[in-house]
């Protein structure tokens, strides 16, 4: 099977490498960054004539493969996904589908009309950890699920890197925080609740990473700052110790100390975190009600030490406590009194070696199985994934307007806009 790769950044290269390892050909690449384009061409043996600057250029060619991996920036997905589907490509599409509801719905409509498969990279559904959690929730061990408490702990260093200095710092250039970081989590909540979402309320803001919170005497860039040796957000302290690994690997292809220092001196990751042009939230709390009566709270926060997810699922007969970082799922059956301990079971799922706890390789395997006829429908088929995107968009609308948003009404409103 032949793939074309549109977007040879970190995510696109991961998916393409898994496809290649399973014996499939990466036949063409589109990537505006010349160095990344060259790296992809060398890694996959792509001839110069099949290397393109943009997805538009690649998609103007005669069909070059069976499927396209689209892993460009959020706001580029629509202009690449629709022509790719019309051209006859199946899609492995990085999330989010699009930050614009009408574009998300248009991609879904095009996929259904053309009969092409679209798998959205909600990779967490494929990790052993979340598969075990789903099995525990759906298996009746705590009875019927009543309510869910879900925390996405972004990690303080991670929010500074990706959502203050980085590519996803502005909702107008990429997506709101809840879409970019947490359409994953909206998808998990639908999956764990076993139902579509009825309504959502949401609250949050950009509270801390603002100029008024900058330390006295600090500078606009770390290279000029007298506090660069002591500030926890100093780019020198954030990136030099992890040269060659994420997140330093995002700054530049040259991971030598000299290369990183130059990137810090001249690039966006060397800016003071209090003086960037970021506008996405640094924390957001959402309250959700599902069609089957399950309720959930979702806390998305950059003010955490660890970068992990913690979940509590509360049922009629017990509760499930899960920590992604600890790789532990604890199931507790309620006792008759507070003096006795309830029946307790601890599950430690298989530890996968690939990214996102095995989800990165899992979604590629799932996509390949679907294209090869070994699987009927992907767990993250476009029709499944649109639900989580409507939830994330509705949550952002609820946050901005201070209202409770009904998901069905929200979707109908944007369907009318998309069809207009």
Residue ranges of each PLM-predicted region?
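N-terminal Rossmann-like dinucleotide-binding module
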Residues: 1-46
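Beta-loop-alpha module in the N-terminal Rossmann-like domain of NAD(P)-dependent dehydrogenases
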Residues: 9, 49-110
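Short, Asp-centered acidic motifs that coordinate Mg2+ and/or phosphate
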Residues: 28, 66-67, 147
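Short, conserved SAM-binding/catalytic segment
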Residues: 39-48, 106-114
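C-terminal helical cap and adjacent loop that interface with cofactors, partners, or active-site loops
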Residues: 44, 280-420
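Rossmann-fold dehydrogenase core element
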Residues: 106-123, 143-148
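Predominantly a Rossmann-like dinucleotide-binding segment in NAD(P)-dependent oxidoreductases
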Residues: 124-271, 402
């Amino acid at each position: 099977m032949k793939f074309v790769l549109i977007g040879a950044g970190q995510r696109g290269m991961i998916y393409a490498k898994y496809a290649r390892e399973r014996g499939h050909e990466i036949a063409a690449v589109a990537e505006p960054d010349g160095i990344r384009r060259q790296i992809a061409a060398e890694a996959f043996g792509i001839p110069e004539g099949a290397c393109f600057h943009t997805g538009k250029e690649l998609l103007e060619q005669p069909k070059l493969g069976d499927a396209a991996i689209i892993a460009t920036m959020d706001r580029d997905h629509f202009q690449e996904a629709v022509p790719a589907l019309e051209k006859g490509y199946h899609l492995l599409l990085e999330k989010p589908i699009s930050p614009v509801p009408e574009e998300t719905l248009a991609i879904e409509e095009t996929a259904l009309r053309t009969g092409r498969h679209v798998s959205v990279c909600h990779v967490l559904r494929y990790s052993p950890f979340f598969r075990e959690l789903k099995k525990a929730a759906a298996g009746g061990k705590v009875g019927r699920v009543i309510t869910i408490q879900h925390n996405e702990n972004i990690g303080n260093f991670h929010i500074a890197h990706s959502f203050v200095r980085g590519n996803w710092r502005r909702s107008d250039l990429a997506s709101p925080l809840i879409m970019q970081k947490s359409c994953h989590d909206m998808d998990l909540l639908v999956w764990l609740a076993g139902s579509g979402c009825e309504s959502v309320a949401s609250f949050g803001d950009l509270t801390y990473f603002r100029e008024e919170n900058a330390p006295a005497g600090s500078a606009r860039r770390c290279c000029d700052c007298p506090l660069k040796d002591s500030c926890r957000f100093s780019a020198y302290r954030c990136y030099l110790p992890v040269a060659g690994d994420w997140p330093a690997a995002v700054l530049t292809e040259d991971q030598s100390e000299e290369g990183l220092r130059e990137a810090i001196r001249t690039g966006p990751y060397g800016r003071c975190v209090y003086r960037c042009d970021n506008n996405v939230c640094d924390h957001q709390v959402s309250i959700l009600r599902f069609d089957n009566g399950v309720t959930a709270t979702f806390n998305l926060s950059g003010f955490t030490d660890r970068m992990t997810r913690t979940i509590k699922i509360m049922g009629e007969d017990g509760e499930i406590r899960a920590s992604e970082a600890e790789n532990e799922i604890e199931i507790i059956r309620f006792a008759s009194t507070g003096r006795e301990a309830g029946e307790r079971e601890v599950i430690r799922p298989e530890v996968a070696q690939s990214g996102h706890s095995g989800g990165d390789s899992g979604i590629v395997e799932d996509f390949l199985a679907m294209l090869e006829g070994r699987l009927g429908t992907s767990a993250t088929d476009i029709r499944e994934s649109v639900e989580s995107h409507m939830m994330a968009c509705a949550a952002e609308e609820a946050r901005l307007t201070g209202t409770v948003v009904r998901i069905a009404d929200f979707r109908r409103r944007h369907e009318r806009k998309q069809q207009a």
